[in-house]
Amino acid sequence: DCLNIGITGTNGKTTTSQLVSGVLESGQRKTMLGGDIGVPLCSILDQTKALDFLTLEVSSFQLETTQFFRPSIGILLNLAPDHQDRYSSFDDYCRIKSRLFQNQQSHDWGIIQSEAMAKLRSLDVRIPGKMLTFSAENRRADVFLDRGLVISQIKGWSGPLLNMADCELSGPHNAENIMAALLVGRALRIPLDAMKRAIQAFKAPAHRGE
């Protein structure tokens, strides 16, 4: 079976899922992008048999109804008040987003923006897998932004990873999307040089100023 990478968050899902695809391909991992976890794609699509990973954008609506979805890597990009017509409170919305991680096991990965992680902790949400954090603002994150440099403080992988000035994408929100993709590569042991080439060449999807 191919493994799932699930990406959720209020903003940045499309850009990040495409960045993650680029990073996977740079590491010779076969991947396909999907946008709906209503169907267990791995069991249905014959072509996924040849895949290593299915990279999925996951909305809060899909997370409301999912019971069994288990991404081997779950990414939470950010949490901002959204769909307020649908949820009774921001806390409620955040709890729904956290369902991305509910079926994970201890060897799975949670890649989570520091600020989103603080919010989940305040709601007593537990992340079962191994956790990596990122942030454009918080320098205590595993990967953070300092004067345009993406810097890691992960043991055995520390130091500057990437200069945003070398990338087509710009701005702190895109820096965070890039950090999430780099951390997927780190979890899968994809060489940094290969990832950097893919990320630096990446152009934003059309109409995705975010």
Give the residues covered by each predicted segment:
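Adenine nucleotide phosphate-binding catalytic loops in nucleotide-utilizing enzymes
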Residues: 90-91, 129-210
